[in-house]
Amino acid sequence: MRECISVHVGQAGVQMGNTCWELYCLEHGIQPDGQMPSDKTIGGGDDSFTTFFCETGAGKHVPRAIFVDLEPTVIDEVRAGIYRQLFHPEQLITGKEDGANNYARGHYTIGKEIIDQVLDRIRKLADQCTGLQGFLCFHSFGGGTGSGFTSLLMERLSGDYGKKSKLEFSIYPAPQVSTAVVEPYNSILTTHTTLEHSDCAFMVDNEAIYDICRRNLDIERPTYTNLNRLISQIVSSITASLRFDGALNVDLTEFQTNLVPYPRIHFPLATYAPVISAEKAYHEQLSVAEITNSCFEPANQMVKCDPRHGKYMACCLLYRGDVVPKDVNAAIATIKTKRSIQFVDWCPTGFKVGINYQPPTVVAGGDLAKVQRIVCMLSNTTAIAEAWARLDHKFDLMYAKRAFVHWYVGEGMEEGEFSEAREDIAALEKDYEEVGLDSYEDEEEGEE
């Protein structure tokens, strides 16, 4: 089997983990204690869900996941929550003190005390796999643990499991909704460190998700649970093809092959449709064409940026539920006729399509309506450079005055790392700019 190990780091990662595993359990009919009444084969049957769950001799299903945080309170909620029997106690790893929103603490001082314990546990999980496919890492850019510890872990995983894919789901600091003043520092530092260790990173911007909750679900003041439920639907759509059999299945490595044209340009934009509340869904039947169209609306994106100002390099549509290829092809043909969607000229308008017949599941008592079909679009577009530009600008404002830098230096970092990281992200912006240029422009420049 092609197993995936999920690693949830820091508060954001752990809370995303909670909602994701809650949803996976519902989708596979696994109870909170790990029993699965529908599964008649005790012991490792050849089921698709074993990519994410391993089965014990007693017929219990245990997630192939690890939760790590440098302070215990968030993971204690898992230890006391309704899914406490689902996870192996050694898969929930906590430190004694906090990452304190400080990349240097997560990466150097506090992180290095706990990293070996985490890697041991990952090694045990990897040993249970017959054909480990790769790692999914969930974290935020802004927190100390999410930024610092994740980058340390990714470096070490590259060393231990060189050829395995590493995908990230990262919470990008929202332009308006900020949880820490030093988010820009942490984000730039972690991006710089993980850039060469990550194969593909799906960014999720809290503010974009807030807006979707407000606009589409009529939630006036969305809580983190509301946000995470929506994020978990997206993660579930991306991983559905690994967990269920479908007509057109997509493997982890297949994502990279189709979405990443150059190793550094590995930040696809995720869009999910339809996000609709139960009251409205009752009155609307959303066709394949409609949901496909709404994927190209900037309002449904997980990161605030405008693809109409950028160009698409690759596009991957993952459908789920009652969808047939004929409808999909018709929907794509309609989209290609629209001029607002521009592809780079060196990439013919290729859409990769995945179809999974498993209908979408929603959490009971949640905000999302149960619908017949959904689509999650992953597109690699040059517009995401806007997100880096915003972050760089904030970084520059603070770094010009060397504000807060002493906290990082005090934890054993060197100031040179800041400028090195900042230059790397500037280079990333430049890379995006160059990729978007038309190829004939490059040739003319070369001749002059």
From Swiss-Prot:
PROSITE patterns cross-referenced by the UniProt entry: TUBULIN
Active site: 254
Its job: Tubulin is the major constituent of microtubules, a cylinder consisting of laterally associated linear protofilaments composed of alpha- and beta-tubulin heterodimers. Microtubules grow by the addition of GTP-tubulin dimers to the microtubule end, where a stabilizing cap forms. Below the cap, tubulin dimers are in GDP-bound state, owing to GTPase activity of alpha-tubulin.
One of the GO biological process terms: microtubule cytoskeleton organization
Positions occupied by motif MREC motif: 1-4
Domain comment (free text): The MREC motif may be critical for tubulin autoregulation.
UniProt entry tagged with the keyword Iron: no
GO molecular function list: GTP binding; hydrolase activity; metal ion binding; structural constituent of cytoskeleton
Positions of modified residues (N6-acetyllysine): 40
Protein name from the UniProt record: Tubulin alpha-5 chain
Residues bound to Mg(2+): 71
The entry's keywords: Acetylation, Cytoplasm, Cytoskeleton, GTP-binding, Hydrolase, Magnesium, Metal-binding, Microtubule, Nucleotide-binding
Species in which this protein is naturally found: Gallus gallus (Chicken)
